[in-house]
Amino acid sequence: MFASRFARVRSAWRLAAVLCVASAAWPAAASPKQAEAAASSAAQVRLTIVVMRHGVRAPTQSPDDLAKYAAQPWPQWPVAPGQLTAHGAAGMQALGARYRQRWLSMSALAPDCAGSGAVVIADSTPRNHDSAAAFTEGLLPGCQAHYLALPTTQNNPLFHFGKDEDKDDAAPAPTLHPDAATRSRLRALQRVLSGCAGSACAAQESPRLDDPQRLQDPAQAAKVLKTAGSLAENLMLEYAQDLPLPQVAWGRADAAALQRLVGLHNASFAYSKRALPAARAGGSNLLAHLLATLQAAAGQAPAVAPLAPADTRALVLLGHDTNLAHLAGLFGIDPIVRGQSDAYPPGGALLLDLVRQDGQDFLQLRSVVPTLPALRANRFDGRSLRERRWPLPGCGGRLRCPLAIALPALQARLDPQRVEAAVPAMTEWPAQAASVGE
């Protein structure tokens, strides 16, 4: 099935997946001698799967649509709502170059473009197409490489099962009673939006997100938290887009304040996306095919189609924050990494490594996320990428779990009614630095 689909990809790319161990920052590049010594003593990473969020985009609502939430006009963006910006595309290209630098330093990436081993898949939205094109160009510059995706007019059920990306909000969830930290963040966000405090705000007609009566009603509280999470993320995106600081949050929130406010986005997703009923509804299909890809690489026969040939060494999927939240729920983790308060930043990723050691296959899970200043500057060197390793379900807290234990534990968390056996017939698209506005 994969021979024809991936033939040109396999003739264009070569990528091994020896990746770093966990630390607070992505480790600095090793010297060739260090890499050779490590390769001789370390376990072999047979496959790495990277599920990454797209790059910096404009808010999904226009400034006019957002106007009712704030006392002052929202900034104008150089692209249509929801689209990747040129800054976001440049960031994804720089992030791809950072992965390239890291993997080349470990003799994991062939510098001459020849050979096989890597597959890049993107969701069908324009921002994901543009992100994949830019990331792949950064990873393999001048290689005339390709990524796989459906046309922008078609939904990809790997990323949005049944085109119901918001219907998992209706999945059973615990009754929402915002805690003290969330209420404090709501008050702080309202001060930023209103530009006032206390009685001075009484004359404003915009709906208040910190209204105690609304927060006492669990149904209303869920709606408030969803709106607040989206608005807080919009402010974060203004900073990440490198807008002039007086325009970011109307000059009323610095980077530290934005990092605190984005906790509302995390809280919203913890309730509506990461909670296991919602995660099973939205993430089962994607995780089923990720696990099938790992099985194929380990020489097993999966029940559903893998996403890449068995000899693939690296698989990169450009998805959304919702995909990362669904996977985090299925993995049973709260994916906060020290140094980045946003659980799902642009360019942030969850990584699954299939490791062979002493004749046995193991699975390990990691987060690699850029910091907020890194996104603003589009510089991903040094401590600008943070990493954390996670235990997997059923593994007793171990950071490297036998595949024979991790696989059935993860499969048991899937909803079989939300899994399609086949993989969409995606086509190849050329990698290039995306040209998407200013």
Residues of each region from the PLM?
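Signature for phosphate-centric chemistry
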Residues: 32, 37-119, 123-315, 321-438
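Membrane-interface motif at the C-terminal end of an N-terminal transmembrane signal
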Residues: 27-28
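Intrinsically disordered, low-complexity regions enriched in Ser/Pro/Gly/Gln/His and often acidic
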Residues: 5-7, 19-20, 70, 422
